[in-house]
From Swiss-Prot:
Glycan attachment points: 112, 165, 187, 202
Keyword annotations of the record: Cell membrane, Disulfide bond, EGF-like domain, Glycoprotein, GPI-anchor, Lipoprotein, Malaria, Membrane, Repeat, Signal
Protein name: 25 kDa ookinete surface antigen
Signal peptide: 1-16
InterPro entries linked: EGF-like_dom, Pvs25/Psv28_EGF
Residue stretches making up the EGF-like domain: 30-59, 61-106, 106-150, 153-193
Lipid attachment in record (GPI-anchor amidated serine): 196
A GO cellular component entry from the record: plasma membrane
One Pfam family recorded for the sequence: Plasmod_Pvs28
Propeptide: 197-217
Organism expressing this protein natively: Plasmodium falciparum (isolate NF54)
Amino acid sequence: MNKLYSLFLFLFIQLSIKYNNAKVTVDTVCKRGFLIQMSGHLECKCENDLVLVNEETCEEKVLKCDEKTVNKPCGDFSKCIKIDGNPVSYACKCNLGYDMVNNVCIPNECKNVTCGNGKCILDTSNPVKTGVCSCNIGKVPNVQDQNKCSKDGETKCSLKCLKENETCKAVDGIYKCDCKDGFIIDNESSICTAFSAYNILNLSIMFILFSVCFFIM
């Protein structure tokens, strides 16, 4: 009975790990961020200067860790902690399951994985946690080079770009939903609108006013 229970518990834990590591899908709604795709995974990217507190949620980060900011996010997957001692100190530390490498918190299993043109992610298809490479768009893992992102290859975009006048585009090594050619994002409505002569005129007027103000100052 104990062996059966132990086996059930082990399988439950492994399934839970796999489920938790595969939270981001094409249907994920990133809170205060947007969805991007690389060759082997999807992830949420934060808007402006926000940081990821988990795989789906972005929040404002604190600029300094002190007694008022304990447990507040100070970077992607990191938070301020209190370090007991004499005197007491405060520091920005990675969340459980992550390690700091080059000032970035990455999964523990990725500490010794080098990908080149891509990044290391957790392999959610493997019941044993391992780090694998997910490549920039235009590159794929090379089995002859320790699965690093050193081989040219295509990845089909799977993002659901459902807003009006937007489409999937490859930008700086990732797929993201962006405005179609001839359209520009309206910051107030977050909708892609036609970049017409009227828009150009408005920009020209703003540029002239800015130039006049600059020279007056």
